[in-house]
Design a protein with these regions (language model features):
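C-terminal helical "tail/cap" subdomain of flavin- and related membrane-associated enzymes
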Residues: 47, 56, 60, 72-75, ...
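Glycine-rich FAD pyrophosphate-binding loop
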Residues: 104, 108, 117-138
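N-terminal Rossmann-fold NAD(P) dinucleotide-binding loop
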Residues: 111-112
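Short beta-strand to alpha-helix junction loop
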Residues: 140-141, 182-204, 252, 269, ...
Length: 574
């Protein structure tokens, strides 16, 4: 048996302990306290370890280590600063005999998709991956539309798309304790096998002339006028015109850029993939069973998510998660796991001793208001979770990056072909998106604020009212929201519906959210309206004019048009 520490199902920066059984022996959870459970699992795993995708191999210490990182994040005490970027201006860094890549992608688990798209368009691309470039056992949950983005950019064929789907299920539930329960179809209803998906993309990438460097981490990046030089931890040096940082929230480059910033919000997640669920044909997108819960010296609202797993008809993944700020007395992952063992059985209608734990999952997901992260250096661009492109109320990762693959692949090709690789031009690929920034009010509304004392049922009531109104307004309102797409007209309809149907609840919302955050949200909501008008009324008349411009101007205007489209949510088409 091997104990693997891997990133979580939807996010390559969340550490997950996977107990991979290679024998017929079954291990059941019988202890109430998670530390005893984890120690039992680790003891059974022994010292035999194996790398299992991004994140590599480790031990039970990963839980303690991640909790220590969470403590440092809350207290803002750490001794580890990001690696120093050396921005030395030399006219001739490149030698004629040097091998120069068009792009080096750091972080292959999610970076392989963009790397393959660029390689298929004739770019010379290398992938640097700290561990083996292979997918993990745990599925990624996505909608079919999101997965089809890989076909759209040429990374997968239609047949390959069907082959990487491990499980498909319907319908999915949204429900809140004592309130609304809504059922929807075809949202996050696919479980995709990362093993098959990464293997397929890796093969296509290599076939297109790509280079993969596995078992190597990034040690330092030096930026020059004519190239960026990546120094790997084994001493290997790569010279490239562009560096794509797809190393997620744990990226040392992001750590340097955000040094000294406390996260504006954090999602803590614990869960398991287990065997023994008889009723296993539907999923939960978001569900609550309890009011606000006291956890140590803090309070929090627990949410649930559950999906059938592709490893067997009785296998099911359940997550318990919460939204918090990064103040010192917030609960640890260990404390949450203690609650998970008590709360999961009644949530799923099972007895803990009747299920076999296959994998234990845990992680934290920091988010920042200043997102997406604009390019801070010439020739370096953050992509995916590293850029903060994910919604503050989502898990990020695979589903978050697929939505932007078409935009990013075409934009990066324009930048490379026109040699527009300075930070000002690269920043246009991570533009301000008002629909993303506006989601912060939802994240705050779903968090328990320590400086106010609302009713323990407030968050459940708020969400129940929201989804009750969305259900009445129909699919054009509820479906985009459940896929992290915020659009002006659906949101305006929702707000009007709440004010008309539940006017007495408005003062409670204002108390929970606060005046300044509400004022900030209003600014983004107005921008969302403006972006919607610009995309619908102005953009169509500009398309032919943009094509007549010089390439450098085309690049700028194409990025502006994309910002209007994606920033207004009109990249979503159902």
């Amino acid at each position: 048996m091997n104990l693997l520490v891997k990133p979580m199902v939807c996010c390559p920066q969340r550490f997950v302990v996977h107990l991979c059984t290679h024998s017929t022996k079954t291990y059941h959870v019988t202890s109430k306290h998670q530390n005893k459970i984890m120690e039992k699992l680790v003891g059974a795993a022994g010292g035999n370890q194996a790398a299992g995708g991004a994140g590599g191999a480790s031990s039970y210490e990963a839980l303690k280590k991640l909790d220590q990182q969470w403590l440092q994040m809350r207290s803002m005490t750490t001794t580890t600063q990001g690696m120093m970027m050396i921005a030395t201006r030399k006219n001739k860094r490149r030698q004629e005999e040097e091998q120069v890549f068009d792009a080096v992608v750091c972080g292959g688990t999610l970076g392989v998709f963009l790397a393959t798209a660029l390689a298929l368009k004739g770019m010379k691309v290398a992938i640097v991956e700290r561990g083996p470039l292979r997918g993990r056992v745990q599925e990624w949950n996505v909608s079919r539309k999101e997965l089809r983005e890989l076909v759209k950019i040429g990374v997968l064929t239609d047949a390959e798309l069907e082959d990487v789907i491990a499980v498909e299920f319907n319908p999915s539930r949204v429900g809140f304790d004592g309130g609304t329960e809504v059922w929807v179809k075809d949202i996050l209803n696919l479980g995709v096998s990362p093993e098959k998906l990464i293997a397929t993309c890796k093969k296509r990438f290599l076939g297109a002339g790509g280079v993969v460097l596995e078992g190597m981490g990034v040690s330092k990046v030096n930026v020059f006028d004519d190239a960026a030089v990546v120094l790997l931890d084994d001493g290997t040096t790569l010279v490239s015109r562009l560096i794509l940082d797809v190393m997620g929230n744990s990226s040392p480059i992001v750590r340097q850029i955000r040094w000294g910033q406390r996260p504006d919000g954090v999602c803590l997640v614990v869960g398991t993939c287990a065997r023994g669920f008889e009723n296993n044909s539907t999923s939960d997108l978001i569900y609550t069973r309890t009011p606000v819960t006291q956890v140590g010296s803090s309070k929090t609202q627990y949410f649930w998510e559950a999906f059938p797993a592709g490893s067997g008809p009785r296998d099911r993944t359940t997550y318990m998660f919460t939204y918090l700020d990064a103040t010192p007395n917030r609960p640890s992952l260990e404390q949450m796991l203690e609650d998970y063992w008590d709360l999961m059985p009644p949530y799923q209608g099972i007895k803990l001793e009747d299920v076999e734990i296959l994998r234990v999952l845990f992680g934290l997901f920091p988010t920042y208001r200043s997102s997406p992260l604009p390019a801070a250096f010439d020739r370096i661009l953050q992509v995916g979770d590293a850029s903060g492109i994910q919604s503050p109320i989502s898990f990020g990762g695979f589903a978050a990056i697929t939505r932007h693959l078409s935009r990013l692949s075409s934009g990066l090709m324009d930048a490379l072909e026109s040699d527009l690789l300075d930070k000002e031009n690269l920043a246009l690929l991570n533009p301000y998106l008002p629909n993303l920034s506006g989601v912060w009010m939802y994240q705050r509304a779903m968090s328990v604020q320590l400086d106010i004392n609302p009713s323990p049922d407030f968050i459940n009531n708020l969400l129940s009212i929201n989804f009750q109104c969305m259900e009445k307004l129909g699919d054009p309102v509820i479906r985009p929201f459940l896929q992290d797409v915020i659009q002006f007209v659906p949101q305006a309809k929702l707000l009007i519906s709440i004010m008309v149907n539940k006017p007495l609840f408005i003062p409670q919302i204002l108390q929970q959210v606060g005046f300044l955050p509400l004022l900030d949200w209003t600014r983004h909501f107005i921008a969302l309206a403006a972006y919607s008008v610009l995309w619908l009324a102005i953009a169509p008349s500009l398309l032919s004019w943009v094509e007549s411009l010089p390439k450098e101007k085309q690049y700028v205007w194409r990025r502006q048009l994309e910002a209007w489209q994606y920033g207004s949510g009109f990249d979503y088409n159902g």
